[in-house]
Structures are given as structure tokens and as C-alpha cells.
Amino acid sequence: MNPEEQRQLRELLRTGRWAAIATARDNEPLASWVAVAAEDDLSGFLLHLSHLALHTRYLEVNPRISLSWSAPDGPDQPDPQQLARVSLQGRVSAISRDAAGYAVARTLYLHRLPQAAQQFELGDFELYRFVPETGRFVPGFGRVHRIGPDDLGALSGPEK
């Protein structure tokens, strides 16, 4: 991956607060959208999900999910297949309110998504942490890079 592609990937993951989520239960796939906050070292991604949402019920049965981000499309982009995009696969787990890291995770999530503060007062929402295991980064049409936790960790350092 060249430095420009590393910059694109870092930006997608650090600033992207809206991601597609793919879940599956009983051989029934489901894709939806969720708000997401990247941890500073990109080792995990925080989701604050309602138990009323179908995707939450799916991931409670099968914690293997995929999250995907894309650079924004727009009128100045003649071909959306040229947009940078990333898809990460891994596992998600709930963060108990009495867990040692809950307060830190909540603070980070609200720093990235301050409008979500009122949702933390609702009883049907729970904080989850997604840990990526594998992924694919496509910086543009016809170019693809397989990525893993070590690649994400390398991105969390200072830009080169």
C-alpha cells in the first residue's frame, strides 16, 4: 500500500461515523447502517445499538459481522467504482455497563458522536466493541489490499 492509499484508509476509518453493517442469522443475511466510532489505535470500533433493531438481534445470535465504509459519492465523482472503500470482518461483543473499560468507551463514542448522548439514557441501547480480524481495502477500481489488525495498528501511528 502506498502512502496515499494509507492516508485514504486512515481517513475512512478515523473519520467515517456511518458504516454499513452485515449480519447473518439462520442463513438469513441482513445489511443495515450504524453509527460507529473508531478507537484511536484502530484496534476496535464502537457501536451503540438498540436491542429493538433487527441487526442487533442478529449479532446477538451470531457475533461475526462485517462493517464497510466508503468515501462519499457526489456530482464531482464521475464513476462511483473509483471511490475508496473498506470492509472489515470480525467479531462484536457487548461492553457491560459495569466493565472496567465501559466509561472510556462511552466517552470516546460520545466524543465522536455527541448527538448520541440521549440514547445512553434509553434502556434498550447497549454499547458494543467490534474487533476486526480481516479486511479488504479498495482505494479505487481494480486495486485491492487485504488488511488485518497489524495493518490497522500501523495506521494508528503518526502519518508519514
Language-model segments: residues:
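Short beta-strand segments in beta-sandwich/barrel cores
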Residues: 19, 65-67, 92, 134-137
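Short glycine-enriched loop/turn motifs at secondary-structure junctions
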Residues: 39-42, 86, 121
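Short, structured beta-strand-loop surface elements
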Residues: 52-112, 125
